Regions:
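Bacterial N-terminal signal peptides that target proteins for export
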Residues: 2-11
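Bacterial N-terminal signal peptides
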Residues: 10-20
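Lipid interaction determinants
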Residues: 20-125
Length: 125
């Protein structure tokens, strides 16, 4: 009956792989970004706990969705006056430099206007 110990080892290995996969792929809650933020261009960015956002600045009013995975946020505009070349998602690493300060570093984005706005320092309003 060599099969039984081998099956136990195989099941234990599969179980450990499953547990490890669950632990490493779970997205982070959007908590660190939730709030209303403003930058030096006068943009006001409201990020909600449900993964939606709203941006109002002197030129545009845009809304959409965002997801957070670790320290990376992916932004997808879904409506409003979107600039040319800004239909696709943008990905940025974020860092809370203090309770009321937030900075972003470009990971990937084709939208020049969004890059210019997002990569400025943001302060809680």
């Amino acid at each position: 009956m060599k099969i039984q110990p081998t099956l136990r080892i195989a099941f234990a290995g599969v179980f450990l792989l499953f547990v490890n996969a669950c632990a490493t792929t779970a997205p982070t809650a959007p908590g660190p970004l939730v709030g209303t933020w403003t930058n030096s261009l006068g943009a006001v960015w409201t990020m909600k706990a449900d993964g939606t956002f709203n941006v109002v600045n002197p030129k545009r009013h845009i809304w959409g969705t965002y997801t957070v995975a670790g320290d990376t946020v992916t932004i997808q505009e879904t409506g409003g006056k979107t600039a040319k070349g800004c239909k696709g998602p943008g990905a940025y690493k974020f860092r809370r430099t203090s309770e009321n300060s937030l900075t972003f570093t470009l990971v990937s984005d084709t939208c020049k206007e969004r890059i210019k706005n997002v990569t400025l320092a943001w302060h809680r309003k």
